[in-house]
Amino acid sequence: VRNISAQGRRGHLRFGISPWEMCEIRDFGDVPLPEANNNEQCIERITEFYDVIAESGVRPVSIGGDHSITGGILQAIAGPKSKLTNGEKAVLVHFDAHTDAFHQLDHFLGAVKSAAHWASYLVRDGFVDASKSIQVGIRGNTRTLDWLDSSYELGYEIITKDQYDEYGVEKCIEMIQERVGDAPIYITFDLDCLDVTVAPGVSNL
């Protein structure tokens, strides 16, 4: 990402915007993860890193990692102690092939705060308001046919990939806007939301 950014193509001709002129942008570097094989510790390290960012009032854009990093980030920048959301819960606009709300699983590869759990525990722990959040692009093969139930139980709205194809872009945008309203929004995007012909290197399909 940094190598591509360094090419200096900073304007978007189609949208007619230049983000580097609209905003003050800084690269804060990588989150140090000395316990890289310990998922639970890594999540807390991410939270510690983002606590400093949130305290300063800076709005972060985060790239990299698997989707479990969202848990660490939102523990810092949303919820009752957050300056960025004025103490409110965040509302998710979540693009993904999976809901990542599988709280019926005791763990995923030994981790509880995992890429399969973050959309659940963030609701349970008071950082995300599922009643105003929406998950878009859900698709793929499943282990069980009730795999969306856990997300619905939490209060999320879901637009599956089939529904997205049926509704079209404009209607989906309207649904998202109606759902989230004027609540503080956190947008998160998993590459496996894209078709495999576009992102063939994504491991979790």
Residue ranges and their predicted role:
Residues R2-L205:
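Conserved alpha-helical scaffold segments that buttress catalytic/binding sites
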